[in-house]
């Protein structure tokens, strides 16, 4: 109790209730893409099954680590010293998730759309769209991300992005982060193909 220096009537309030403002997560992203592992108990049971994870370590315990990289060309100077390398990798979701946690990320949802492929077309439009549709059943995610889809051709990428925007427009509780293709730095192809529906959610 404080010591008062002047005579007067003082009222002290004693709080019997905890503070009424509770900490609430404001944004929970959902990462949709390919993973090393797609099986937890039965074959493929992690595919298109949104799962909440709290850390990169927990992600790795369910889904495995990132893909192996293929060096397609190494550039050397005249003395034979390494300058740079061209690396081939179609799967970037693991790296995106790692950067998310490196920058203070918290809980998020993971939707595996399949395992890494060693041959054929690495990223399939219909698989990624199915992952986007699967996350619609979960109420918590507020941000949809599908970084692996950026390697699709322009038409297929636009189809996936339109599916995500459609979901955001219907549910009205989430937004989508839409990546541009590497060959479209000014976004001309993106603007031509994305359409006009639900753009405020992207």
PLM regions and their residue ranges:
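Surface-exposed assembly/interface segments
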Residues: 1-202
């Amino acid at each position: 109790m404080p010591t008062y220096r002047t005579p007067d009537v003082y009222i002290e309030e004693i709080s019997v209730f905890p503070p009424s403002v509770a900490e609430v997560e404001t944004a929970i992203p959902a990462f949709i893409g390919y993973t090393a592992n797609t099986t937890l108990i039965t074959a493929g049971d992690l595919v298109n099954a949104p799962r909440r994870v709290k850390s990169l370590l927990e992600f790795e315990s369910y889904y495995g680590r990132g893909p192996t990289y293929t060096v397609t060309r190494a550039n050397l100077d005249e003395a034979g010293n390494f300058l740079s390398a061209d690396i081939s990798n179609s799967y970037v979701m693991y790296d995106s998730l790692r950067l998310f946690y490196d920058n203070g990320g918290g809980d998020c949802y993971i939707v595996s759309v399949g395992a890494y492929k060693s041959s054929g077309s690495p990223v399939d439009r219909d698989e990624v769209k199915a992952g986007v549709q699967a996350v619609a059943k979960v109420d918590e995610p507020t941000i949809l991300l599908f970084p692996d889809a950026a390697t699709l051709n322009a038409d297929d990428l636009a189809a996936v992005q339109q599916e995500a925007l459609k979901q955001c427009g219907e549910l009205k509780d989430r937004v989508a982060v839409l990546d541009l293709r590497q060959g479209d730095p000014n976004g001309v192809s993106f603007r031509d193909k994305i359409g006009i529906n639900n753009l405020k959610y992207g």
